[in-house]
């Protein structure tokens, strides 16, 4: 009987194995969520709460920060964790800001180009300005006169003839040697407010780049001794005041003989040294002597032609100048013909735009400043702006041909009034004013 049936001990084992199978399946189905499991079992890379870990508890970080039981703990470990979190948050914020600025700069580069986009981004404060783009702000940060000098350094000097190049002032208009002599004799005579009519003296340095080209090329055909129009000669007193602060840096580095050679490039250096030595090193007086002596090189025909002035109605080509004393007097507002408040004057052609029209120094034998500031001209200046061209035809100055070079250093202010005003027009009025003073 033992050989026919299986052993009795094997029957309950199979029954127990079949009965335990559904129990294990039900156990796997009844487990909780996997986020609540310990880190040792599964998903060890899940973020955990650091404060709970300091106190021996492992908690998943998702949705746990508000409900953490140690969120207000002030122990040493929790304080260190809070400091680390603050540093990490600052680093993340900085990286986000840098990434945003780079994106905005990249968008500006796509819209405006590389250089303009970076310059625009630096101007808007998106990115800090770099040294490569400091050129855009160098002109604006300097003063007004320095900016004018810098703009004219960029001007191509090769377009200007050699005789006109040293006569360019920092104000942007060519100045003749005669106007420099007038301005040099009395540098502090008048204020810059006496020139309201001109364009470049009002401070608009942007209009300076176009004006010197036409003016310089227009006067380039004349000799270095050519005379500028009435505006640059009569207004040179105020021009000197404007030139002094702007050209002070360059004038400090030049010697007097260098200034003379720059003003008179056609003269020999030895002659200029002799004149400067005779004037005691005074550059202004040396320039005045050279300009006064230059007119005596002319022939007798030139003197007779310049002396025969029409007395009724001057033409365009005449060298007739009736209002020289009134125009040179700064007490009535220098640039009388350009002022908006002065009476109407004849046109610019009447005042002799051609060369040798206003050369007072040579053939008139009078220093323009002494004529302007003398007692006679002060009396004449109050009537000269209100007189027409035909009403006061000419000032009969006697051309002294017999004066030597050394005699020009004399003071012509003591010349008798009958010798200066030979025509007798306005003689009593002028003489009375002279006697009162």
Curated annotation (Swiss-Prot):
Keywords: DNA-binding, Metal-binding, Nucleus, Zinc. The keyword Thylakoid does not apply. GO terms for molecular function: metal ion binding; sequence-specific DNA binding. Residues 254-289 form the DMA domain. CDD domains: CUE_DMA_DMRTA2. Coiled coil: none annotated. This is Doublesex- and mab-3-related transcription factor A2. The gene is dmrta2.
